[in-house]
Design a protein with these regions (language model features):
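Bacterial N-terminal signal peptides
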Residues: 5-16
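Short alpha-beta junction capping motif
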Residues: 69, 129-168
Length: 168
């Protein structure tokens, strides 16, 4: 329980690491898009990073006994203004940076790869904490609504991150 309390206290502080990624390479806000984004399972699979990603390992026997940063990949609304609502904002650097900082400043063991999941992914329920960026223009598909509802009612945590201003 102490680890969970510490984690919940540190997340607001570490969320700044996500915001710090806003003006990395590519378009402002880290909006560069690569086709690999649609099929990647981890942030490390993407061939492009603004800085070399940090590397660390965990003991092999504890591969499933770690915190895993899990980003939700979703459709972009066709009605959104340019750049609004894209799930890949600050990806992959923010995922790797937050995971590294959690590993660095807490006693948590953190998966160095993180995950990218769709809400319909059967593995969703293996991750108690999921991250969704730019939900201001979120439009869930009919099949995603009951899955997300069940995930949340079963104790899953959704962090919704939106830095675009008051209009959202």
């Amino acid at each position: 329980m102490k680890k969970f309390s510490l984690l919940m206290l540190l997340f607001p502080l570490l969320a700044g690491a996500l915001g710090a990624q806003r003006w990395r390479g590519g378009l402002p806000g880290g909006d560069s898009y690569y086709p690999e984004f649609e099929t990647c399972r981890t942030a490390r699979e993407v061939p492009w990073h603004s800085t070399p990603p940090p590397n660390w390992t965990n003991e092999a026997g504890f591969a499933k006994d770690v915190f895993t940063f899990a980003r939700i990949r979703r459709d972009t609304s066709p009605y959104s203004p340019w750049r609004a609502g894209r799930w890949w904002t600050d990806f992959p650097d923010s995922d790797l940076n937050l995971s590294f900082r959690l590993q660095q400043v807490t006693s948590l063991k953190v998966d160095p790869d993180g995950r990218v999941l769709n809400l319909t992914d059967p593995d969703l329920f293996n991750y108690p904490w999921i991250y969704m960026v730019e939900p201001g223009s979120l439009e869930l598909r009919d099949e995603e609504v009951p899955i997300l509802k069940r995930y949340l009612l079963n104790g899953g945590v959704l962090m919704a991150d939106d830095f675009w201003g008051e209009w959202q």
